[in-house]
Amino acid sequence: MALPKTLHPALTPDELAFLAEHDHISIVPLFSMTRVRLISGIYGPFRPPSASRVPLWLGLSLKKKRKCRIVPPEWLSAERLQAFLRDEKENSEGFERLPRRFMEISKVLLDIASDDLSQPTLLRSLLKDIREVRQAKIRMGLQSEDVLQNDYLQVMPFSSLCPVALRRHLTRYGIGDQSHSLGTV
């Protein structure tokens, strides 16, 4: 059963992943080429084994064609994710600061470039644990206003909440009404 438009979240997880593809990552090209001029900018030169910075969408496209290896962001390692998880669990008052578009970039890299990542199964598990801890905090925050006002709450965990529960919470605090679209809150 499809939800009415007023109960749809502002952005779907796929739309958030699309937006994250504009962030830059490092790649190690498996080909040689001088600079390439695209609408979004000039990238290159591409000379193996030197790393190049490109938008995530370009890195993913080259990866699918087996033209590069993606260098994972420094925060996408088992040690860093374990530290994020530990800090998130210890901070019961709010949310820990995570890198920009943390969940979206992680998901895309694990889906397309898992062979370039160290211990992808462990990374998936840690990311799931972090997401679950944050979602539990959000659910608890639906009882009070405080958690929802935290600056470090990222879009993806918030957008994955049940739209009906989110609508009920927003209405309770006078932030929206039944005719108000979630996309404009």
Curated annotation (Swiss-Prot):
For the keyword Nucleus, the answer is yes
Spell out the Pfam families in the cross-references.
PSF2_N (PF25005), Sld5 (PF05916)
Q: Which InterPro entries match?
A: GINS_A (IPR021151), GINS_bundle-like_dom_sf (IPR036224), GINS_Psf2 (IPR007257), PSF2_N (IPR056784)
Q: Which GO terms describe its cellular component?
A: chromatin; CMG complex; GINS complex; nuclear replication fork
Q: Where in the cell is it found?
A: Nucleus
What does the record list as GO biological process? chromosome segregation; double-strand break repair via break-induced replication; nuclear DNA replication
Assigned keywords, A-Z: Chromosome partition, DNA replication, Nucleus
Q: Does Transferase count among this protein's keywords?
A: no
Chief place of localization = nucleus
Quaternary structure, per UniProt, is: Component of the GINS complex which is a heterotetramer of SLD5, PSF1, PSF2 and PSF3.
Biological role stated in the UniProt entry = The GINS complex plays an essential role in the initiation of DNA replication. Has a role in chromosome segregation.
Provide the family line: Belongs to the GINS2/PSF2 family.
This protein's name: DNA replication complex GINS protein PSF2
Naturally occurring in which organism (per UniProt): Cryptococcus neoformans var. neoformans serotype D (strain B-3501A)
